[in-house]
């Protein structure tokens, strides 16, 4: 597993207490980076997640070899190149480990419909079973609890809420930011 973390953003104090109060077993905040916008023609190239439980936090972060060339325009967004994924495992192998990491904990993602579209499509293609856990979307949540925000993009919310977002558009950094946005939203709810 490769990790890209500049600094720890582990939940503490009231944020962690609220997450654990509402989700005693814990939650998994996740993010994907992809070669494009459609799961039917594009591929996952990075999967990351942060698991939050009463015992603490753990991380999953891995590049995925998509088996296709990564388009230049998406390299310009996330910075992930063909060379970076050349020795990485394929999506089926990574997905199996990712699902084991998540277990049956509730999942949280920013713009969850996008990430879930890829996860469900790839799981179906590889005959993997999607966990029967609820999924929460911080983008939808922010529209309810952070109505004053100029928009509900991950980077905007992070900036407005004082959440460091180093390496934006890398999956682990975005999963960490999603986790903090989720916790802050739960405190406001």
State where each predicted segment sits.
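Conserved non-catalytic scaffold segment of RNase H-like nuclease domains
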Residues: 2-132, 147-169
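Generic alpha-helical structural context detector
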Residues: 140-143, 159, 180-183
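Mixed-charge, glycine-rich, non-catalytic linkers/tails in nucleic-acid processing enzymes
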Residues: 185-189
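Short, glycine/acidic-enriched loop or turn micro-motifs at the edges of active sites
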Residues: 34-36, 140, 177
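Conserved beta-strand -> loop -> alpha-helix junction used to position metal-binding or nucleic-acid-contacting
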Residues: 129-142
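Acidic, divalent-metal-coordinating active-site segment for phosphoryl/phosphodiester hydrolysis
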Residues: 170-183
């Amino acid at each position: 597993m490769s990790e890209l973390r500049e600094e720890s953003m582990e939940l503490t104090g009231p944020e962690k207490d609220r997450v654990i109060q509402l989700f005693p077993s814990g939650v998994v905040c996740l993010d994907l980076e992809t070669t494009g916008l459609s799961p039917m023609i594009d591929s996952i190239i990075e999967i990351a997640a942060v698991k939050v439980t009463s015992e603490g936090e753990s991380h999953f972060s891995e590049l995925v070899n998509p088996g296709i060339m990564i388009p230049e325009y998406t390299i310009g967004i996330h910075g992930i190149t063909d060379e970076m994924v050349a020795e990485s495992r394929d999506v089926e192998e990574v997905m199996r480990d990712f699902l084991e990491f998540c277990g049956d904990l509730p999942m949280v993602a920013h713009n969850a419909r996008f990430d879930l579209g890829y996860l469900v499509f790839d799981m179906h293609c590889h005959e993997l079973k999607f966990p029967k856990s609820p999924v929460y979307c911080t983008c939808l949540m922010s529209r309810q609890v952070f109505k004053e925000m100029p928009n509900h993009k991950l980077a905007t919310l992070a900036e407005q809420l004082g959440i460091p977002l180093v390496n934006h558009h890398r999956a682990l950094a975005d999963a960490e930011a999603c986790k903090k946005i989720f916790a802050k939203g739960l405190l406001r709810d």
